Regions:
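Aromatic-rich peripheral "rim/lid" segments of glycoside hydrolase catalytic domains that contact
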Residues: 315-378
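Active-site mouth of glycoside hydrolases
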Residues: 22, 27-193, 198-206, 217, ...
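Hydrophobic h-region of N-terminal signal peptides that target proteins for export
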Residues: 9-17
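Positively charged n-region of N-terminal signal peptides that target proteins for export
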Residues: 1-4
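Structural motif corresponding to alpha-helix initiation and N-cap regions
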Residues: 57-61, 287-290, 322-325
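Short conserved micro-motifs at the rims of enzyme active sites and ligand-binding pockets
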Residues: 46-47, 230-234, 343, 351-352
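Hydrophobic beta-strand scaffold residues
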Residues: 115-117, 304, 339
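Active-site region of glycoside hydrolase catalytic domains
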Residues: 21-25, 31, 137-282, 287, ...
Length: 378
């Protein structure tokens, strides 16, 4: 009798595990073509902060309708947890702020789009998680409360992303922290799918070092901006040589790279630009890089998405930018990986990473070259 009971128990556990795994695989199909919504509930650096005016007006119903009309099936909503967390009371989320977030989520869902609630704090917030266990405890309490709040929402349409680009250099500590945060989310929302990632910048190398969580109702994700020499040309943050780059071509061409390298102020940075051409960055190279992520997912039998990829618009040639976006998107789709481009670009005046030409005032309009590169229609 004991053997029979044990056998039944093992079969039940096995069936439950397969069911949870199939949930994640099935739900990943809702996340095929997405766009990031940034600078709304995160990345707000205006001294006024997260004001009511900003939260109710940065992205409008017209924007969400435009996203739907372009052919996207979901959005990734960046959320900075800091404005919602009070010291030692992280599980008590302010109702007014939560009300604005509820309004945003409802607006997205009302347009038939799924939404990823992407926890997207600043680097200082993440540094505390790296160094202090008490900060991890508070963040766990916050996640548990937020997940519980949204636990009544359709789990086919609402997803919880643990932490954007964790910036943990110690992948073993990140493994423990991620498992704890995932458990807190699961406590709050037993039926919803969680999105996890590798340590540090969540790139492919970080993904390859990741061992999947024991929770099977999880989708894994990575970010792809390789090579940054091309995708971040003209950027005023990050590596100092990016700022001096302009019109670096894609696919890589040595003659073009030599011209761009000549504008660098020192020899080391000139060599960094030349390496871009020497590494032969083209569609084949992109396929090889992303193929590693696809093989990792196949090995572990887990669903996988790419939740960020894109090219900074200000100093890149529009056609070269479109070619890179096309090649990344086509490779992801070939490998069965859902994607999320960075980003929508509301009111960035066409100078950021956006899929729209976002004026400071007035309606956003699709950037047709980018829309076509994404295989979408408008």
């Amino acid at each position: 009798m004991r053997k029979l009971i044990l056998l039944c128990l093992l079969l039940s556990v096995s069936a439950l595990a397969q069911n949870n795994s199939s949930f994640a695989q099935q739900r990943a199909r809702h996340l095929r073509r997405g766009i990031n919504l940034s600078e709304w509930f995160a990345q707000v650096y205006d001294p006024k902060g997260y004001t009511k005016e900003h939260l109710v007006g940065w992205v409008t119903a017209d924007d969400v309708a435009l996203i739907k009309s372009m052919g996207f099936d979901h959005v990734r909503l960046s959320i900075n947890p800091a404005p919602m967390m009070h010291h030692n009371e992280a599980d008590r989320i302010p109702g007014d702020y939560l009300g604005y977030l509820d309004g945003a989520v409802k607006m997205v869902l009302d347009h038939g789009l799924a939404v990823i609630l992407d926890m997207h704090p600043d680097s200082d917030f993440k540094a505390k998680l790296v160094q202090r266990d008490d900060e991890v405890e508070q963040f766990s309490d916050f996640w548990r409360a937020l997940a519980h709040h949204y636990s009544t929402y359709d789990p086919e349409m609402v997803y919880f992303e643990i932490l954007n680009e964790p910036e943990f250099r110690d992948r073993y500590r990140w493994a423990g922290v991620q498992a704890k945060l995932a458990a807190a989310i699961r406590d709050g929302a037993p039926k919803h799918t969680i999105i996890a990632a590798g340590a540090n910048w969540s790139d492919i190398d970080d993904l390859l070092e990741l061992t999947p969580l024991s929770d099977l109702n999880v989708i894994y994700n990575f970010h792809f901006y390789d090579p940054h020499t091309f995708t971040h040309q003209g950027a005023t943050w990050g590596e100092n040589y990016w700022h001096f780059e302009t019109k670096l071509a894609y696919p890589a061409e040595m003659h073009n790279a030599e011209q761009v390298a000549s504008e660098q102020p020192d020899r080391l940075n000139r060599l960094r630009v030349l390496r871009y051409a020497l590494d032969h960055w083209d569609a084949n190279r992109i396929a090889v890089e992303i193929g590693q992520a696809a093989e990792w997912a196949k090995h572990w039998n887990v669903p996988l998405t790419c939740n960020e990829f894109g090219v900074y618009r200000r100093d890149s040639d529009p056609q070269d930018r479109a070619r890179w976006i096309h090649d990344v998107r086509a490779t992801l789709e070939h490998d069965g990986i859902g994607w999320n481009m960075w980003d929508y670009g509301a009111r960035d005046d066409g100078g950021g990473f956006g899929v729209v030409n976002g004026p400071k005032e007035g309606p956003n309009t699709p950037d047709e070259v980018t829309v076509q590169a994404l295989g979408l229609k408008h």
